[in-house]
């Protein structure tokens, strides 16, 4: 999966954001194991997954603050 764009994340519903976070956490878990066993080819994907999670969480927090 490529880096997520801000506009794409803002278009997601809160449930879709939660699902995306769960999927990214699973992917990150698998990538960490691949790195530990020496099978990981694209090491930059670890950073992208971590940052995608942060992007989604940040936008979700902004949207929650806006609705209050």
Curated annotation (Swiss-Prot):
GO CC, alphabetical: cytosolic large ribosomal subunit
GO molecular-function terms, A-Z: structural constituent of ribosome
Naturally occurring in which organism (per UniProt): Bradyrhizobium sp. (strain BTAi1 / ATCC BAA-1182)
Family: Belongs to the universal ribosomal protein uL29 family.
Gene Ontology biological process terms from the UniProt entry: translation
Gene it is expressed from: rpmC
UniProt keyword annotations, A-Z: Ribonucleoprotein, Ribosomal protein
InterPro entries: Ribosomal_protein_uL29, Ribosomal_uL29, Ribosomal_uL29_CS, Ribosomal_uL29_sf
CDD domains: Ribosomal_L29_HIP (cd00427)
PROSITE patterns, A to Z: RIBOSOMAL_L29
PANTHER family with a match to the protein in the record: 60S RIBOSOMAL PROTEIN L35/50S RIBOSOMAL PROTEIN L29, LARGE RIBOSOMAL SUBUNIT PROTEIN UL29C
Entry protein name: Large ribosomal subunit protein uL29
Chain segments annotated as coiled-coil in the UniProt record: none
Keyword Metal-binding appears in the UniProt entry: no
Keyword Signal applies: no
């Amino acid at each position: 999966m490529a880096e997520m764009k801000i506009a794409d994340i803002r278009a997601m519903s809160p449930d879709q954001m939660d699902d995306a976070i769960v999927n990214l956490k699973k992917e990150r878990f698998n990538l960490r194991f691949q790195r530990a066993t020496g099978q990981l080819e694209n090491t930059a994907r670890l950073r992208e997954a971590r940052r995608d999670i942060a992007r989604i969480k940040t936008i979700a927090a902004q949207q929650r603050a806006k609705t209050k």
